[in-house]
Amino acid sequence: MNRYVSVLALSGIAVLAGCVAPTPKPNDPYYAPVLPRTPLPAAANNGSIYQAGFEQNLYSDRKAFRVGDIITITLNEKTQASKNANSQVGKTSKTGIGLTSLFGAVPNTNNPLGDGDLSLSAGYSGDRATNGKSSAGQGNSLTGSITVTVADVLPNGIIAVRGEKWMTLNTGDELVRIAGMVRADDISTDNTVPSTRIADARITYSGTGSFADASQPGWFDRFFLSPLFPF
């Protein structure tokens, strides 16, 4: 008996452990800054007016376009979703049978109780109806800015960027992570790009600490909210 109790206890702990969301940790290698693949050769400072180390093409600008360059992303995300459903199903049926004779004979319809004549007629009626309503709504808003690095440049000129920002507050840590693809034409002259212009964007806003823990249900509540709960 004790063995079965131990097995059930361990199974319950495993189920509850699977319901716990993973806590984000800093220094994720995926979001680490990306450095240039090959270092640029050092240019000799051999001129007082012109130096090769600070040369720039006549038609180029200071926008990020190489691996390891820095670019600032302006976060301006706002989503609003709602859904309503209303369904009604109904069915009505009615059946009546009227008989005046039974096998060719007319039975005696006198009621011995004196409440009227008896009849062979019969009837049936039934109604069924089902109504269902459901509604759901969700809204999110995220504003701010984060500076990331260029992780890769595709052959067609699309720039892959990713990075993260951690902020340590009195009650815990807050983080913002972002990764996606940016067109070079969408980068403004001040080397910024809005988050709405990022393709395949992966934006994460989370945190740790007392505030984040307070928003999470306890282990007992997670047990009843688990999809494995039979009721």
UniProtKB/Swiss-Prot annotation:
Record's subcellular location: Cell outer membrane; Bacterial flagellum basal body
Q: Which UniProt keywords apply?
A: Bacterial flagellum, Cell outer membrane, Lipoprotein, Membrane, Palmitate, Signal
Any one cellular-component term (Gene Ontology): bacterial-type flagellum basal body, distal rod, L ring
What is the protein's given name?
Flagellar L-ring protein
Instruction: Please give the function described in this protein's UniProt entry.
Output: Assembles around the rod to form the L-ring and probably protects the motor/basal body from shearing forces during rotation.
What is the scientific name of the source organism? Pseudomonas fluorescens (strain SBW25)
Lipid attachment locations (N-palmitoyl cysteine): C19
Q: Which family does it belong to?
A: Belongs to the FlgH family.
UniProt-listed PANTHER family: FLAGELLAR L-RING PROTEIN (PTHR34933:SF1)
Any keyword Zinc?
Answer: no
* GO terms (BP aspect): bacterial-type flagellum-dependent cell motility
